Structures are given as C-alpha cells and as structure tokens.
From Swiss-Prot:
Localization terms from the record: Cytoplasm, Nucleoid
Protein name per UniProt: Transcriptional regulator MraZ
BP GO terms, sorted: negative regulation of DNA-templated transcription initiation
GO cellular component, one term: cytoplasm
SpoVT-AbrB domain residues: 5-52, 81-124
Protein's UniProt keywords contain Cytoplasm: yes
GO MF, one annotated term: transcription cis-regulatory region binding
Alphabetical list of InterPro entries matching this protein: MraZ, MraZ_C, MraZ_dom, MraZ_N, MraZ_sf, SpoVT-AbrB_dom, SpoVT-AbrB_sf
Signal peptide start-end: none
Quaternary structure and interacting proteins, as annotated: Forms oligomers.
A Pfam family of this chain: MraZ
Stated family: Belongs to the MraZ family.
Keyword annotations: Cytoplasm, DNA-binding, Repeat, Transcription, Transcription regulation
Length: 152
C-alpha cells in the first residue's frame, strides 16, 4: 500500500527517482514494473504496479467498443499507457507525451493512493489540495451515503 506525498525532481532526461521507501515493495512484489497512464479527471498521471494495472485492463476489456463514452475511456487510458521498469537507481523514465499531459516540470509530487501513485506538477498539486479542502469544508459529509459511517 502506498501512502504519503513526496516532493521529487524530474531530471533533464525525463526521469524521476522513486522514493527509497517504495522501491523494495515495488521490486519484490511487482518486479519493478509500473504502468503509467493519464488521470481522466485531473492533469496528473497515475502510476500502477503492473499487477494492479492488469486488474484495470481486465475491466477495460469488458467495455464496449461501440459505445462512444466507453471507447473514449479505453482510448485515453490505454492510448497513454506506458510500461516502465525501475532501473538500478530506482528511477523510471516518464515518456514525453505523459510529461506534456500533466504539465510536468522539474518539481513534482508523488502521492500514494493505496494501490497506485498520482504524479503531479508541484504547483498543480498545491492547488488541488486547496480545492480538496474547500470541497470537504463545503460538503455535508454526513449526507454522502458512502461517507456517512466514515470516521477518523
């Protein structure tokens, strides 16, 4: 399980170093193989260990190619999907189309989301956090069916 936010840098070759605390689980449980694709609702990237991505692919396989919305979803997620592997220094290469999609520059945030990571431009991440806080403050959480029994 991946949790926490880490500030990392994108090098001049388009690589990022995965924080040390995640490298061993990624190597041992997933042979260092990661699939990167786009988030369809935000300007960020999603990084899935290969096994987790294969579960997504199984769901995508069940979608219709004749339904415009379902086909569009498949095109976005699969069309941008790139499989990468951790190198000996725990780095992965972010392909240029993915870097462009998420407007990634030098300063990046890697955010654990349990079974995957999100990869954000640092300024976009800070703005997203502000928006999340505003949403949480403005919504009546108890009226949200899925959150009604959620407690910290």
């Amino acid at each position: 399980m991946f949790r926490g936010a880490s500030a990392i840098n994108l090098d001049t070759k388009g690589r990022i170093a995965i924080p040390v605390r995640y490298r061993e689980p990624l190597q041992l449980e997933h042979q260092g193989r990661i699939v990167i694709t786009v988030d369809i609702q935000s300007a960020c990237l999603l990084l899935y260990p290969l096994h987790e991505w294969e579960l997504i692919e199984a769901k995508l396989l069940k979608l219709s190619d004749t339904d415009k919305t379902q086909r569009s979803l498949k095109r976005m997620l699969l069309g941008y999907a790139h499989e990468v592997e951790l190198d000996g220094n725990g780095r992965i290469l972010l392909p240029p189309p993915l870097r462009q999609y998420a407007n990634l520059d030098k300063r990046i945030m890697l955010v654990g989301q349990l079974n995957k990571f999100e990869l954000w431009d640092e300024q976009a991440w800070l703005q997203q956090i502000d928006e999340c806080q505003e949403t949480i403050r403005s919504e009546e959480l108890a009226n949200n069916e899925r959150l009604a029994d959620f407690s910290l």
